[in-house]
Amino acid sequence: MRVTATGVSVTIDGTTILDDVSFTAADGRVTGLIGPNGSGKSTLLRCFYRIIRPQQGTVHIGEHDVWRVPARRAGQLRAVVAQDQELDNEYAVRDIVAMGRIPHQRLLERESTADRAIVDEALTRARIEWAEGRRFVTLSGGERQRVLLARALAQNAPVLLLDEPTNHLDIGAQLELLELIRELGLTTVAALHDLDHAMSYCDAVVLLHHGRVVAADDPVTVLTPQRLADVFGVRGATTTHPLTGQPHLVFAAPRSERELPR
């Protein structure tokens, strides 16, 4: 199911955060939202999961305007792994993952046999089934992210929205999580801070700067030396990763303005 933003503008306390933003994330592909801090990545994602309502423009999942459907239906359309989600640390892992079934249940409805099977599958797909009886507080950062991903998978939504999913994780946990997300095959839109992660794991990227779309295409096409200089103020180039053979970004800080591409 495609994800589309059309002419989205957001102003908060007199400051324009997003200015006429449009993009489309293709069905079954991983699309990265990239840009410097303050470029509007997280705000754009929050428009899709109904935290921030655009003053102008629309956001769609498939044919559904996410602000015109009931909250329960919105929860069936997209699952979210947000930054720094607060949870009661005393919850057991399985209980947290089972929360993903709430959009599919009526008020006060108990967990069904089908719900339990879906939770089992989500735990397995996120490779955290071994911890289902553990308390959330006892897990490492990478393990907690897998639990939150499993909860999202339990929603059985066609679209996955991720806001800085590798934040605060060590490098091994980062790579494991990104590999897992790629393997899921879901339509995924992820705000990413690490440009090399975007290069390696995204099918397409949307580059934001000062709340506007600078470019949207495959990572190699978007992350040119000129754009890296203009948007991020660094010297950069695409090379071939010596271990994977895939495109890989390398960076260097400019010693002077003259060293930036013109």
Where are these regions (language model features)?
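Conserved structural motif at the start of ABC-family nucleotide-binding domains
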Residues: V3-A5, I17-D20
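Helix-to-loop junction immediately C-terminal to a conserved catalytic motif
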Residues: Y49
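Conserved ABC transporter NBD signature motif
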Residues: G57-R68
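Catalytic Walker B motif of ABC-type/P-loop ATPase nucleotide-binding domains
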Residues: L160-E164, L169
